[in-house]
Each structure stands twice: as C-alpha cells, then as structure tokens.
Amino acid sequence: MLNYVIKRLLGLIPTLFIVSVLVFLFVHMLPGDPARLIAGPEADAQVIELVRQQLGLDQPLYHQFWHYISNAVQGDFGLSMVSRRPVADEIASRFMPTLWLTITSMVWAVIFGMAAGIIAAVWRNRWPDRLSMTIAVSGISFPAFALGMFLIQVFSVELGWLPTVGADSWQHYILPSLTLGAAVAAVMARFTRASFVDVLSEDYMRTARAKGVSETWVVLKHGLRNAMIPVVTMMGLQFGFLLGGSIVVEKVFNWPGLGRLLVDSVEMRDYPVIQAEILLFSLEFILINLVVDVLYAAINPAIRYK
C-alpha cells in the first residue's frame, strides 16, 4: 500500500506540469488586455504600456512561462496583478471559507442522500421509494443559482430568518450549504439506492435473514458496508466537485471564497491568481482520488494495491 501511495504521489509531477502548461496557454488566450483593465478606461497608450512592462507582459510568451514555472516549483506563484499581494496570501485568505462551506454541504448531503437512498432501496417500488426519488430528481434538475435566489427570497427577504451575505457566523452557512449540497444529496440518494438494490439481492443477505437476524441489522451491518465501495467513489468525486465548483453559489451569496476569487480574477484577467487556483483545484482532485483508493482497502480488506 505504501509503495502504491508513493507511486501515485510521484505521478503528481507530470500531471501538474501538463495542467500548468494548459492553464498558462488558456489564460493567455483569454480576450482582453489585463494591462488596460488595470490601468483603467481613462489611461492612454503610454500608461498602458508602462503597466504592461511592470507586469512583465511585454516579455515573450516562452520567457513568461519559464519565469512562471520556475517560481511555481519553489512555491512562489507571484503577485496578483490587481491587488499586488502575493497570490499565496490571496488564496490562503479565501481557502477556509470555501473549505468549511464544502464540508458543511457535504456532511448534510451525505447524511440525507444516503438515508434517502437506503430507504428507497429497502422499500423499493413503494411510496417511500417514489417520494425519495422524486425529491432526488428535483434536486438534480433545479439549477444552483435559481435555488439560491429562491432561498434568499424566502428565508432572508420575506421571513428575515437568515442573513444573505457574509461568512461570519454559523447562520451564514445555512443557505449556501443547502444550495451547494442539494444536487450532491440528490446524486448520493440515487447512487446509494442503485448500489443497495444490488446488495439486497445477494446470497449473504438472504443467509443473514434466514439465520433470524433483524432486518435493521441486516441492512446496516451486511448491506451498508458492501454497498459503500461505489458510494465512496461518488463521495470523493462529489467532494472534489464541491470544493472546486462552488463558483455559482459563492457568486450568488457573495461568499468570500475561492470560487468568487476565481470569477473576479477571470474578469480582471489576473493571470497569476487564475493559474494558481486551477493548479490547486487539480491537486485537490488528484489527492481526493488517492484518499478514495486508500478507503477502498479500509472498507473491503479483499482489495489490495501493488
């Protein structure tokens, strides 16, 4: 297992290098001139050229890439073109709000989604199954921005129960986490149901029932563990999507996180921040997949990696 983990970690190097090249080319293909955006609409050509020189944008593209990649290897992602602060500081100040929002969304989505999926599988083709799957389909179908606006209108504007923007208290997390986790809960419910339906028809489940084991214990002990392997895969992927895909929700709720920082950086063509954030999201996905693979062996000891 240790050798497998080390090999996977070493595989990060070429993967991140390829991502770095693609991201660098992508951001430089974006329309618009960051020097003009930063200088302002009233700036003349001389001022814009001066800003371009200060940002290093007057250098050849290959020179800019070499400067970027050589510094990135040392953990230096440069300065933000907009704030002139270190990119690492910009990301660090936004990381924790996004992480806590992701964890909050994931916790309630997994609990609700797995419970709904198990109930739907145990009472298959009956009203609990139909109700759970109807709610799940609704959760998948409803766009995040529309759900967020609806929740703000009802619980913040009309009822005045919850705040709309900010991340200062636990109350600020309720509406964004509900919005962000709704689709994940729906996917988890459908995936758990499909996995449990397969497990419930296995011979060891019938054997446990024949031995007089209670249905609750059969479902929780024998069914849950064996149905968890594909579900864990989905949990890992969904966590990665939540962590890197909260852009719409953060924009709707004016959340001070990485998603909003990325949107603002794209609008202002802040190349260093865009490159660093996408690299961070890529690293997160790779590490999450590695953790999922390790969890496989913990859930099912029959799985071994070489």
Curated annotation (Swiss-Prot):
Primary subcellular site in the record, as a coarse category: membrane
Intervals, Cytoplasmic compartment: 1-8, 124-134, 190-228, 299-306
ABC transmembrane type-1 domain: residues covered: 95-292
Compartments, as annotated in UniProt: Cell inner membrane
Cell inner membrane found in the keyword field: yes
GO cellular component, one term: plasma membrane
Known function: Part of the ABC transporter complex GsiABCD involved in glutathione import. Probably responsible for the translocation of the substrate across the membrane.
Protein family membership: Belongs to the binding-protein-dependent transport system permease family.
Cited PANTHER family: DIPEPTIDE TRANSPORT SYSTEM PERMEASE PROTEIN DPPB-RELATED, GLUTATHIONE TRANSPORT SYSTEM PERMEASE PROTEIN GSIC
Name recorded for this polypeptide: Glutathione transport system permease protein GsiC
Species annotation: Shigella flexneri serotype 5b (strain 8401)
Lineage summary: Bacteria, Pseudomonadati, Pseudomonadota, Gammaproteobacteria, Enterobacterales
